[in-house]
Amino acid sequence: MYRLLAMKRFFIKYMVAVLLIMVAAKAIAQPKAVQDSLAKANTLYATGEYDKAAQLYEAILLKGFESKELYYNLGNACYKSNQITKSIINYERALKLSPKDEDALYNLAIAKKMIVDNIETLPEPGFLRWWKDMIAALTTDQWATRSVVAFLFFLGLFGLFLFTTKAGIKKLSFWFSLLFLVYSIFTFSFASSQKSRLTGSDKAVITERSLSVKGSPSETGTELFIIHEGLTVQITDQLGEWIEIRIADGNKGWVKENSMVKI
């Protein structure tokens, strides 16, 4: 009886955690007014009025609505109106929501050819790249759904293990329940990772025309190197108004927070 009560409490806590992740990740349905604004912005873009289209896309974002398509369209409008840095920011935001989107990846690569800095990227370890790709293969909701389904299978099989008297079934149900539990835990962690990636800000785009990167979080810090507008950097630490960044070649330093836009 005690084991059943403990399982029930564990199940409730687990389901609440999974549902919270799913609710937090669920996109807000677009009301008709937003759909109309989006259609108008798309029409403006199609007729070559890129500045007006960009303004309308931004107005939709200010209302609290976002999607990969919206950021991608805004990136295109900014690029067409020669706002290269803003186009990079929005392509990066589109890729944050959909890391494998080929159109956004291609257009981002084109936009980055227009900026001053061309920094060679350090190769990422194969296993780490594979791990990130695996997590990014599904959305937060999809991972969370798999976690719930696997956990339900675990409960059913573990219940069978507890109550069956047949040795063969008892053994099989135990090992299969363990397998589903492990899968459920992994998929839950993948859902959590996806949620953290979507809600966190560990990347930024430099908005200063030319920026001195310091060796310490101070105006009097030693100048390490110079970077320029449009460069995407990794945020590694923050101390007040100073942010420690890492660029693609691995070099690190400190810059002011107001010199960048977080992704």
Region spans (language model):
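Beta-loop motif signature
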Residues: 46, 199, 206-235, 239-240
